[in-house]
């Protein structure tokens, strides 16, 4: 098929009017063909342009598939909020006295294992407060024997632990972390870790011995705050020789240790980033030191509360998900605010099974 240019079309049109009417139809036939071809070409061009514009959108839709839910590799289960200490900066305070029935807690732990959990850390409150440590011991044994978790750990203030507990449950526990913010007993009293006639530091040394005797890896957690920020703990930490010394910057959580609904007023304990860095510099010779600033700490932990709800701390306060017992792990973890990249960046995954630590007991 041939196509006329606009100039040729005008010339042809003039020639039509010069011809007799008898030949008019023969002259118009090529014009109709030209018009038809022209409109067809325009329509084809427009369709191609629309396809080109649409392709990136379709690609974008394919790229914007919803992300897969996070895997609960390491979970911190605060099964109780009750505590026998009154640490001024505590960010998980005794707002309820609820503790799940043992079998319900086990059901939730099984759900977590099925979702990919490798490490469980029991915390509080003070976890040894419930049933004098028996509730905790049964959960520890369940996780190691029945769930076969690579790592089972506890964070405690250490004041209620007895040697009998190690005799009954020590073999099932990988790591015991004891909170110790100062080796000056007067500072411990100021912070709220006073034990009356007991000495927190002396008790820490006794627990270190029990951990060695019963083959439990020993760890120390310290919160750097206004009252201990100038203290040098290098020699004491080296003498105790923990596998890890976790050093946290004092953190404010609205509704827990600051704000109208809080049970603590932690503002007086807060230090700035520069002060925290100076404290870390002072302890740089401690090889087991693992620092955690507020930035690293806030969103890099998967925290379950006493109802087995994930707690989202992204907005500076704890916003609970629905319980994993009601909606399952995959649905609840979507609302956890968990930053998996920061978890890995802060060294959240490490050698955490005592079988792999190869310790010289």
UniProtKB/Swiss-Prot annotation:
It comes from Pongo abelii (Sumatran orangutan). Homodimer. Interacts with IRAK1 and TRAF6. Interacts with FPPS. Interacts with HADHB. Interacts (via C-terminus) with VAPA/VAP33 (via C-terminus). GO terms for molecular function: 4 iron, 4 sulfur cluster binding; lyase activity; metal ion binding. The keyword Transcription does not apply. It is a peripheral membrane protein. Residues 69-289 form the Radical SAM core domain. Its cofactor is [4Fe-4S] cluster. The lineage of its organism: Eukaryota, Metazoa, Chordata, Craniata, Vertebrata. The N-terminal region (1-42) is necessary for its localization to the endoplasmic reticulum membrane and lipid droplet. It holds the Pfam family Fer4_12. IRAK1 and TRAF6 synergistically activate RSAD2 increasing its activity with CTP as substrate about 10-fold. One of its GO terms (cellular component) is lipid droplet. PROSITE patterns: RADICAL_SAM. [4Fe-4S] cluster binds at residues 83, 87, 90. GO terms for biological process: CD4-positive, alpha-beta T cell activation; CD4-positive, alpha-beta T cell differentiation; defense response to virus; innate immune response; negative regulation of protein secretion; positive regulation of T-helper 2 cell cytokine production; positive regulation of toll-like receptor 7 signaling pathway; positive regulation of toll-like receptor 9 signaling pathway. NCBIfam families: viperin, viperin_w_prok. It comes from the Eukaryota. There is a cross-link at residue 206 (Glycyl lysine isopeptide (Lys-Gly) (interchain with G-Cter in ubiquitin)). PANTHER family: RADICAL S-ADENOSYL METHIONINE DOMAIN-CONTAINING PROTEIN 2 (PTHR21339), S-ADENOSYLMETHIONINE-DEPENDENT NUCLEOTIDE DEHYDRATASE RSAD2 (PTHR21339:SF0). Its main location: endoplasmic reticulum. This is S-adenosylmethionine-dependent nucleotide dehydratase RSAD2. Interferon-inducible antiviral protein which plays a major role in the cell antiviral state induced by type I and type II interferon. Catalyzes the conversion of cytidine triphosphate (CTP) to 3'-deoxy-3',4'-didehydro-CTP (ddhCTP) via a SAM-dependent radical mechanism. In turn, ddhCTP acts as a chain terminator for the RNA-dependent RNA polymerases from multiple viruses and directly inhibits viral replication. Therefore, inhibits a wide range of DNA and RNA viruses. Its EC number is 4.2.-.-.
């Amino acid at each position: 098929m041939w196509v006329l240019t606009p100039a040729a079309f005008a010339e042809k049109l003039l020639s039509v009017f010069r011809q007799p009417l008898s030949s008019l139809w023969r002259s118009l036939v090529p014009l109709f063909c030209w018009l038809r071809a022209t409109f067809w070409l325009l329509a084809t061009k427009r369709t191609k342009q629309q396809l080109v514009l649409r392709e990136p959108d379709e690609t974008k839709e394919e790229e914007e598939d919803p992300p897969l839910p996070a895997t609960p590799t390491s979970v911190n289960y605060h099964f109780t909020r009750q505590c026998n200490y009154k640490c001024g900066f505590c960010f998980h305070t005794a707002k309820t006295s609820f503790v799940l029935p043992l079998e319900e807690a086990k059901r939730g732990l099984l759900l977590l294992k099925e979702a990919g959990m490798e490490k469980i850390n029991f915390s509080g409150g003070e976890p040894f407060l419930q049933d004098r440590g028996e509730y905790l011991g049964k959960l520890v044994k369940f996780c190691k024997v029945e769930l076969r978790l690579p790592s089972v750990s506890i964070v405690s203030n250490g004041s209620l632990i007895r040697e009998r507990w190690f005799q009954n449950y020590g073999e099932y526990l990988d790591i015991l972390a004891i909170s110790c913010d100062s080796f000056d007993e007067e500072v411990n009293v100021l912070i709220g870790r006073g034990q009356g006639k007991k000495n927190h530091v002396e008790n820490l040394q006794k627990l270190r011995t029990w951990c060695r005797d019963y083959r439990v890896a020993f760890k120390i957690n310290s919160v750097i705050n206004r009252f201990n920020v100038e203290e040098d703990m290098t020699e004491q930490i080296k003498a105790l020789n923990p596998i890890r010394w976790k050093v946290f910057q004092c953190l404010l959580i609205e509704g827990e240790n600051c704000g109208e609904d809080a049970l603590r007023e932690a503002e007086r304990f807060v230090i700035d980033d520069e002060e925290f860095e100076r404290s870390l510099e002072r302890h740089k010779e401690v090889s087991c030191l693992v620092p955690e600033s507020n930035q690293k700490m806030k969103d890099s932990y998967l925290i379950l509360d006493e109802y087995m709800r994930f707690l989202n701390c992204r907005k500076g306060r704890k916003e609970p998900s629905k319980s994993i017992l009601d909606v399952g792990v995959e649905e609840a973890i979507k609302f956890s605010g968990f930053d998996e990249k920061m978890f890995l960046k802060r060294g959240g995954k490490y050698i955490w099974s005592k079988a792999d630590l190869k310790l010289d007991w």
